[in-house]
Amino acid sequence: MKHQVAEILSKVIDQFKQEGVLDASFQPRVNVENTRDKSHGDFATNLAMMLTKVVGKPPREVAEMIVARLPESDVIEKVEIAGPGFINFFVLDVAKFDVLPSILEAGETFGECNVGQGRSVLVEYVSANPTGPLHVGHGRGAAYGASVASLLSKAGFRVSREYYVNDAGRQMDILAASTWLRYLQHCGEELTFPSNGYKGDYIFDIAQSLYEEKGDALRKPAENVFEGVADDEVTTADGETLGDKEKHIDDLIEKTKVLLGDEHYRVVFDKALDAILGDIREDLAEFGVEFENWFSERSLMDSGVIDAALEKLQAAGKIYEKKGALWFKSSEYGDEKDRVVVRENGLKTYFASDIAYHFNKLERGFDVLIDIWGSDHHGYVPRVKAAMQALDTNPEALEVLLVQFAVLYRGGEKLAMSTRSGQFVTLRELRDEVGADAARFFYVQRKSEQHMDFDLDLAKSKSNENPVYYIQYAHARICQVLSLAEERGYQLDTEMGLANLNRLTQEPEADLATLLAKYPEIIARAALAYEPHQIAYYLKELAHGLHAYYNSTQFIVEYEPLRNARLTLVVAVRQVLQNGLKLLSVAAPEKM
């Protein structure tokens, strides 16, 4: 309906050009928006105010000129000029139902559009270090990323979903060392576990599995392991901190590698990696989050991509040596300072891997790269964009979307979390408690960059205050009505229903039709803004309209034309509810 109003206004502009009011080359942008107040009509435009300087007349006078030239329309009931020159359009109630045939014909594809025009997009999200189970913070990134990818697919983009596996670097070495130390304890060795090691129960499980496979084959005396290792950090009774936990764990990593040797160290490393990554894959699949590609950081090293990217930067004069390290001139591209890419000891930094990874993404030919990161990585954005620019690529091709971590509340009390200490609520535990549907919806019902308090009690409640329950109940209510009609011997005749839409004269019916017509526009707008919360908000609004209609109207009436018209309307509502919920990977139950 909105595009029809825009087309009418475009015809007025053409007439202005023919009359010489506007220059033939002038191309004004025609803005048509939904009104917030029904007393102001259904749609409004500020076209008169946009043209006032060009036409040389006050905006209200320009508005009168526009209204006088509006062609006849079979959808517009009346037009009013308001305020300084807004033009409000009132749509005939019967015309509001014109969207219903499109919904019934398109079915699950209703709402899809082509604003993406087939452009290829790589959406990389979650990408949690495989050092432990996914926690509830990762869950928000997973739900948001999956919903953004689905939105883009519905909007005409060619979408690839990718998980970047950080299977190299210090954190993975800490994981391997932690696993081996727990394995030694299984072997009967007595030792003090490092304060900076991974302490979760999952480490015990992996170590036990390793022991069951290898027996004592990887056992070394604990005194050999800790010989020459820097003291761990401890706090004395009077509050003094002694030792160095970072040096302690780094020394233990080195001793682990030396004592095990390359082959056996790789056995421990791969055992921990495979166990945790396998759990992550399973966890995400159960959460309705799938990826086409799991991209290994280690593959960047093995294939020489990191060296190739750094060589390209070096050839462009963007890398220099200082104090034995190699630095990238990121400050030339807006970063606050230059960044190390190769340390004094010859080891490449995480940033070097990230440069190579984004270089690889561009080499694969994607038009748009979307990185979805935790908000704690906000300072990392300028340096990555700087690297892309230095590699002679368009930094605007990269969109970095930040996600605030979720904070859980149960019984009004905040739940504390720490991954390293093993004190956290896993995504699996959250799903077990509130269900995947509630988790997926709650995670995306606010802007990703907004702080999120996740109320576990609310997510489990069967009340109208729980938004996902409220929306699913609207869908179930429609299914219940249709089932009841069948039980009474009334078969739905949508052809008759569509032919009698003029019998739908109640305000809730027109309101529902207006909401249904908005869905394709919401999809396009939400996709371009990367904002799935717009879909969540829309579904709540549509569910509210359905519940209001249900509470005020009898659907199964004796008069067949009216009955079929009303049932056809709610079938259309059911379809759009299904489409929106499916986009967010939330079920649409038929019974509740």
UniProtKB/Swiss-Prot annotation:
Keyword Mitochondrion: no
Example GO biological process: arginyl-tRNA aminoacylation
Entry keyword Protein biosynthesis: yes
GO molecular function: arginine-tRNA ligase activity; ATP binding
Subunit and partners: Monomer.
InterPro entries given in the database record: aa-tRNA-synth_I_CS, Arg-tRNA-ligase, Arg-tRNA-synth_N, Arg-tRNA-synth_N_sf, ArgRS_core, DALR_anticod-bd, Rossmann-like_a/b/a_fold, tRNAsynth_Ia_anticodon-bd
Family statement drawn from the similarity comment of this UniProt entry: Belongs to the class-I aminoacyl-tRNA synthetase family.
Primary localization: cytoplasm
Lineage: superkingdom: Bacteria
Subcellular location: Cytoplasm
Keywords per UniProt: Aminoacyl-tRNA synthetase, ATP-binding, Cytoplasm, Ligase, Nucleotide-binding, Protein biosynthesis
Sequence motif 'HIGH' region, residues: 128-138
Catalytic activity of the protein: tRNA(Arg) + L-arginine + ATP = L-arginyl-tRNA(Arg) + AMP + diphosphate
The name this protein goes by in its record: Arginine--tRNA ligase
Pfam families associated with the record: Arg_tRNA_synt_N (PF03485), DALR_1 (PF05746), tRNA-synt_1d (PF00750)
E.C. number: 6.1.1.19
SUPFAM superfamilies xrefs: Anticodon-binding domain of a subclass of class I aminoacyl-tRNA synthetases, Arginyl-tRNA synthetase (ArgRS), N-terminal 'additional' domain, Nucleotidylyl transferase
Gene name tied to this protein: argS
GO (cellular component) term, any one: cytoplasm
UniProt cross-references to PANTHER family, sorted A to Z: ARGININE--TRNA LIGASE, CYTOPLASMIC, ARGINYL-TRNA SYNTHETASE
